[in-house]
């Protein structure tokens, strides 16, 4: 299955240890999404629409109230990229 360039970028970041944290409003609806690198830096470029697409693809999931992490399916979807470190 092909995924977009932005989805690819976020999944690659998450495969390296990144996470997605959500904030909810008083009605328990998601109001904001934040993506953090493994070093703890905030990564811009993740919005609610992209979050929902990744969740619909089952590329990310949360367990036990923890931040969203990449799944096995997400690892299969992401193509290998050279690490620039």
From Swiss-Prot:
Family statement drawn from the similarity comment of this UniProt entry: Belongs to the UPF0386 family.
Protein name per the record: UPF0386 protein RL2079
Pfam families per UniProt: YjhX_toxin
């Amino acid at each position: 299955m092909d995924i977009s360039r932005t989805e690819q970028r976020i999944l690659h970041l998450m495969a390296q240890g990144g996470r997605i944290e959500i904030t909810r409003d008083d009605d328990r609806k998601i109001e904001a999404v934040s993506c953090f690198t493994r070093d703890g830096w905030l990564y811009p470029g993740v919005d609610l629409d992209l979050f929902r697409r990744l969740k619909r693809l089952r590329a990310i999931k949360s367990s036990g109230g923890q931040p969203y992490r990449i799944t096995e399916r997400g690892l299969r979807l992401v193509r290998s990229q050279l690490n620039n470190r």
